[in-house]
């Protein structure tokens, strides 16, 4: 089997010409001379993937080691790290296999290569979907902890968290299997795009509401201690910057990939869209970058997790 038949790179079937979406592919002379294609070296792609793997393995191992971190919040963080780990691992594995095939160091047998490609695509796609779900779950967990603080432990119990986690994983695997099987149907692509937009809106609404509550709380404290208003304004500005960074990273890392899916449906033959299609590997690299950033935002900022990680690393040395 030719190497090109395996080079899909995570849903890479979208990077080729789907049969049910007519004439997605364009001839090279139709894309125009000004088409910008950002080439991602395999070495850089592998390096980012390995960094993400190490980070997320540390998060999962640290949470598993410390029983004090077996709360619903840390369960969601652990599952997010596991999802990001699978995203990175799937891409790294696929890239390594592609490089081995290109170097003729691995025999390309259709009976083995194609099923392996399908398995990698399902694992990577399901981990991407679950990663988005767990980002939403973490946002909802924080929201409940702020607005229902007194009832939090009765609302977000460990059994309920485990049920939610199991439901997310099962739904992610089922949806991803259908997506890989019917990737050439526009409705399937649109469902995935709508899912991303729903997660984006959910996170934006929850975090904006949490920021507003935090500002009100800071204002109340300032009035209680007869502080000056600039203190409250400074707190609000800091919170707004944090919120912008949080949602901005999410949108910048995930948005281009889902823009790619949207354009496949809306303008498969337009030269400008075809130029965007050429940067598919760049969009995957941004997702890997998100898998690197997630532990920094959601895991390593927590003091208990950092302390456990430090103790583990110290003992290992």
Curated annotation (Swiss-Prot):
Give any Gene Ontology cellular component.
plasma membrane
Localization terms from the record: Cell membrane
- Show the Pfam families listed in the entry: 7tm_1 (PF00001)
Q: InterPro entries given for it?
A: GPCR_Rhodpsn, GPCR_Rhodpsn_7TM, Melcrt_ACTH_rcpt, MSH_rcpt
Transmembrane annotation, as ranges: 38-63, 73-93, 119-140, 164-183, 192-211, 241-266, 280-300
- Residue intervals annotated with topology Extracellular: 1-37, 94-118, 184-191, 267-279
Residues bearing glycans: 29
GO MF term list = melanocyte-stimulating hormone receptor activity
Q: Does the keyword Cell membrane apply?
A: yes
Residues with lipidation of kind S-palmitoyl cysteine: 315
Give coiled-coil spans as residue ranges: none
Cytoplasmic compartment residues: 64-72, 141-163, 212-240, 301-317
Query: Alphabetically, which GO biological process terms does the record hold?
Result: adenylate cyclase-activating G protein-coupled receptor signaling pathway
Q: Which PROSITE patterns match?
A: G_PROTEIN_RECEP_F1_1 (PS00237), G_PROTEIN_RECEP_F1_2 (PS50262)
Q: Which UniProt keywords apply?
A: Cell membrane, G-protein coupled receptor, Glycoprotein, Lipoprotein, Membrane, Palmitate, Receptor, Transducer, Transmembrane, Transmembrane helix
- Family in the record: Belongs to the G-protein coupled receptor 1 family.
Protein purpose:
Receptor for MSH (alpha, beta and gamma) and ACTH. The activity of this receptor is mediated by G proteins which activate adenylate cyclase. Mediates melanogenesis, the production of eumelanin (black/brown) and phaeomelanin (red/yellow), via regulation of cAMP signaling in melanocytes.
Q: How does it assemble?
A: Interacts with MGRN1, but does not undergo MGRN1-mediated ubiquitination; this interaction competes with GNAS-binding and thus inhibits agonist-induced cAMP production. Interacts with OPN3; the interaction results in a decrease in MC1R-mediated cAMP signaling and ultimately a decrease in melanin production in melanocytes.
Which protein are we looking at? Melanocyte-stimulating hormone receptor
Q: Which gene encodes it?
A: MC1R
């Amino acid at each position: 089997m030719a190497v090109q038949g395996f080079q899909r790179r995570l849903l890479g079937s979208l990077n080729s010409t789907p049969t049910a979406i007519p004439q997605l592919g364009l001839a090279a002379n139709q894309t125009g001379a000004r088409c910008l294609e950002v080439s991602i070296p395999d070495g850089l792609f592998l390096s980012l993937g390995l960094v993400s793997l190490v980070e997320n393995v540390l998060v999962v191992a640290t949470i598993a080691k410390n029983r004090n971190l077996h709360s619903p919040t840390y369960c969601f963080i652990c599952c997010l790290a596991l999802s990001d780990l699978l995203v990175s691992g799937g891409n790294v594995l696929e890239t390594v296999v592609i490089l081995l095939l290109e170097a003729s160091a691995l025999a390309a047998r259709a009976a083995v290569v194609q099923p392996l490609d399908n398995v990698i695509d399902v694992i990577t796609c399901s981990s991407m979907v679950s990663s988005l779900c767990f980002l939403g779950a973490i946002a909802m967990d924080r929201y409940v902890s702020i607005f229902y603080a007194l009832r939090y432990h009765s609302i977000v119990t460990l059994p309920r968290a485990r049920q939610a986690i199991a439901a997310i994983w099962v739904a992610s695997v089922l949806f991803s299997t259908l997506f890989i099987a019917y990737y050439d149907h526009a409705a399937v692509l649109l469902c995935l795009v709508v899912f991303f937009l729903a997660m984006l809106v959910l996170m934006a609404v929850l975090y904006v509401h949490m920021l507003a509550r935090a500002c009100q709380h800071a204002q109340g404290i300032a009035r209680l201690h007869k502080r000056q208003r600039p203190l409250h304004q400074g707190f609000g500005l800091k919170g707004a910057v944090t919120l912008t960074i949080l949602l901005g990273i999410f949108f910048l890392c995930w948005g281009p990939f889902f823009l790619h899916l949207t354009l496949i449906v809306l303008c498969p033959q337009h030269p400008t869209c075809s130029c965007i299609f050429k940067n598919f590997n760049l969009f995957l690299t941004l997702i890997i970058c998100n898998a690197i950033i997630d532990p920094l935002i959601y895991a390593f900022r927590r003091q208990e997790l950092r302390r456990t990680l430090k103790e583990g690393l110290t003992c290992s040395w």
